[in-house]
């Protein structure tokens, strides 16, 4: 079967790839068809994205020899490390002790190294061509890095300006029409909504392609024109919270199907509360695992509030802890005033207060998670915390260092998504499920709204007071 677009015919160009239209499959088929001895270099943005792409390529039977896949930042690190004299960078930046400043310094050094033109020969000797995935997520310096590589290698960039949602905290994304296409001329657009066709929901896929055009030119989305696969939950004043909770419990139309619940990107606490109240739901975490790192930084085993800190942390990742009641019970048990014997979790908590060690803290967390009726709804955070506590108990690191190490290991894993997951558009972009539930469309830009609506392959649920969704302006 011929490729939908022949990427080998593109010397330098860009492919516009709307959500669910087979971009990853096109990359896989291109790599399968690759016959040269030199591999194709494939760059993307996140370590989780790299892991997911590798897994997809393995499933497609793509031989490892056909490609090298990396993040743009990871490739930049290896590049300047291989040519330190020419790069002239401070070697300390490769240690990533200060990621907020080290990554920009690494990108800047790689950009200058490529712009100097010294690497043309080694790059041509190593790679056949370059493909860059999710190009809309590039900031201007990453765009300059890819532009430098494109001076040497045949290059095709693939992405969708309607999914450019990482433009925050001063991270200026490259503009598709003004900056990408002048350097990488338009070479094609994917137009078949494969995600929905394969799920038997072609009407939904075609509608999403149509509203993409509307959103792109600043028009609203009218849910009254949507196909039957889209369900509008009309929110009523005073009952919005309950209605959203009910919507979050929407079942997938297929057996063992998956549901993505897309909440408010700003109100993280609100998302976690909804996750804790939704049976079977689990939170999708930001890669920085900030709550874990803050807990590790502040947890004082020898402090008077050690049990309170531990219980509060447990309450933030699982249900059924009852932090205040646990502390009261421990005090009663320790003073001999308790009328009922301790539960296993209470017994571990009493032992922890008497001997506040990392091992004891870990036993408390494990016992709380195993209580009848308890449910861990932030498993990633708990897993990394357990891993860090085990490292501390083994004497290999302090808690903060161990937590950061656990986080960095976790960052390189392909994300394992629960059958019912809760997150924001930023956290769920690139993922798909049978059903997407959009809880706060009124807070979304056109790009965020498009990303949210395109996560569900069979069914989309939208909660709003008005059937006409008017995106908010960027910025």
Range-by-range predicted roles:
Residues 1-475:
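The feature marks helicase ATPase cores and/or their adjacent C-terminal helical subdomains
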């Amino acid at each position: 079967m011929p490729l939908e677009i022949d990427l080998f015919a593109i010397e330098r160009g860009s492919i516009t790839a709307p959500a669910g239209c087979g971009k990853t499959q096109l990359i896989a088929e291109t790599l399968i068809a690759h016959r040269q001895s030199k591999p194709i270099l494939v760059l993307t943005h996140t370590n989780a994205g790299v892991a997911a792409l590798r897994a997809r390529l393995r499933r497609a039977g793509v031989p490892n020899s056909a490609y090298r896949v990396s993040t743009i930042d990871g490739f930049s690190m290896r590049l300047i490390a291989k040519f330190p004299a020419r790069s002239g960078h401070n070697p300390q930046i490769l240690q990533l002790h200060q990621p907020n400043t080290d990554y920009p310094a690494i990108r800047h050094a790689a950009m200058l190294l490529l712009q100097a033109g010294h690497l043309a020969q080694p790059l041509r000797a190593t790679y056949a061509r370059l493909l860059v995935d999710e190009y809309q997520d590039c900031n201007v310096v990453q765009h300059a890095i890819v532009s430098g590589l494109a001076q040497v290698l045949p290059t095709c960039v693939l992405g969708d300006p309607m999914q450019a949602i990482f433009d925050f905290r001063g991270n200026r994304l490259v503009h598709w029409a003004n900056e990408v296409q002048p350097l990488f001329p338009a070479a094609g657009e994917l137009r078949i909504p494969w995600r929905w066709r394969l799920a038997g929901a072609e009407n939904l896929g075609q509608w999403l392609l149509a509203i993409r055009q509307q959103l792109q030119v600043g028009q609203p989305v009218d849910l009254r024109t949507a196909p039957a696969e889209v369900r509008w939950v009309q929110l009523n004043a005073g009952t919005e919270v309950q209605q959203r909770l009910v919507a979050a419990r929407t079942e997938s139309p297929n057996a063992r199907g998956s549901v993505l619940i897309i909440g408010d990107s700003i109100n993280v606490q609100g998302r976690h509360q909804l996750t804790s109240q939704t049976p079977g739901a689990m939170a999708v975490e930001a890669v920085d695992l900030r709550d874990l790192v803050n807990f590790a930084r502040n947890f004082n085993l020898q402090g008077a509030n050690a049990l309170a800190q531990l219980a509060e942390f447990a309450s933030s990742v699982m249900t059924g802890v009852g932090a205040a009641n646990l502390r009261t019970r421990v005090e009663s048990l320790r003073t001999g005033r308790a009328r009922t014997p301790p539960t296993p979790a209470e017994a571990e908590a009493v032992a922890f207060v008497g001997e506040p060690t990392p091992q004891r803290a870990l036993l408390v967390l494990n016992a709380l998670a195993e209580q009848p009726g308890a449910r861990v709804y932030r498993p990633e955070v708990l897993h990394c915390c357990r891993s860090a506590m085990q490292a501390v108990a083994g004497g290999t690191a302090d808690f903060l260092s161990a937590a950061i190490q656990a986080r960095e290991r976790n960052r390189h894993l392909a994300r394992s998504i629960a059958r019912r997951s809760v997150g924001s558009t930023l956290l769920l972009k690139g993922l798909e499920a049978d059903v997407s539930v959009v809880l706060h469309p009124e807070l979304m830009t056109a790009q965020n709204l498009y990303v949210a609506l395109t996560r569900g392959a069979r069914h989309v649920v939208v909660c709003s007071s008005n059937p006409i969704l008017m995106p908010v302006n960027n910025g």
